[in-house]
Amino acid sequence: MGAILGKKIGMTRLFNEKREAVSCTVIEAGSCFVTQIKRTDKEGYDAYQVSYGERKEQKVSKPLQGHYKKAGVTPGYTLVEFSFAELNQELAVGSQVSVEGFNVGEKVNVLGVSKGKGFAGVVKRYNFGGGSRTHGQSDRLRAPGSVGGSSDPSRVFKGTRMAGRKGSANITVKNLEIFKVMPESNLIVVKGSIPGPNNSYVKIISSKK
């Protein structure tokens, strides 16, 4: 049980004990350090702030340099927060969060941001059928069609599916099984796919179900 911040390396295939090829995703989960502990009496909620990776001090802003120095850790690439229940362990500022808290066969939830597709029409974004290909139609093949009534309701309903930005959404994939844990390399291998492109950051949290 636990949680950690990781970076998606990519997908591969590994063989299980039955010599079956299993599609897996490799996640580099470390090095992660606790940079701040937030409390209800001060910040209004309880959470651990965790950094990922190590980078040169001059690569981060002056305020963040002071923040990392106060915690006594090397500056990282990003900062995220985990609730006390998610990390499920007592940690002090400056302590390291490692992959050793995870076991093979354990189920985890992976949270990430999906790949951005840019501005997309309704056919690509929502799998609309488009207009008729005949009966004199010339420019309505990929159009959404009518989006609102006339006198009643005389408006477009909220949430009507239209063209817009596709992707770049927060996605959670639940109950992925851990296929392999490599503490010496800070790697976790999970079965199946996870959201986001390669080198994107993801949160790995033990599943409660």
Swiss-Prot record:
<dbReference type="GO" id="GO:0003735">
    <property type="term" value="F:structural constituent of ribosome"/>
</dbReference>
<dbReference type="InterPro" id="IPR019926">
    <property type="entry name" value="Ribosomal_uL3_CS"/>
</dbReference>
<keyword id="KW-0694">RNA-binding</keyword>
<dbReference type="Pfam" id="PF00297">
    <property type="entry name" value="Ribosomal_L3"/>
</dbReference>
<dbReference type="GO" id="GO:0006412">
    <property type="term" value="P:translation"/>
</dbReference>
<dbReference type="InterPro" id="IPR000597">
    <property type="entry name" value="Ribosomal_uL3"/>
</dbReference>
<comment type="function">
    <text>One of the primary rRNA binding proteins, it binds directly near the 3'-end of the 23S rRNA, where it nucleates assembly of the 50S subunit.</text>
</comment>
<dbReference type="InterPro" id="IPR009000">
    <property type="entry name" value="Transl_B-barrel_sf"/>
</dbReference>
<dbReference type="GO" id="GO:0019843">
    <property type="term" value="F:rRNA binding"/>
</dbReference>
<keyword id="KW-0689">Ribosomal protein</keyword>
<keyword id="KW-0687">Ribonucleoprotein</keyword>
<keyword id="KW-0699">rRNA-binding</keyword>
<protein>
    <recommendedName>
        <fullName>Large ribosomal subunit protein uL3</fullName>
    </recommendedName>
</protein>
<dbReference type="InterPro" id="IPR019927">
    <property type="entry name" value="Ribosomal_uL3_bac/org-type"/>
</dbReference>
<comment type="similarity">
    <text>Belongs to the universal ribosomal protein uL3 family.</text>
</comment>
<dbReference type="GO" id="GO:0022625">
    <property type="term" value="C:cytosolic large ribosomal subunit"/>
</dbReference>
<comment type="subunit">
    <text>Part of the 50S ribosomal subunit. Forms a cluster with proteins L14 and L19.</text>
</comment>
<feature type="region of interest" description="Disordered">
    <location>
        <begin position="131"/>
        <end position="155"/>
    </location>
</feature>
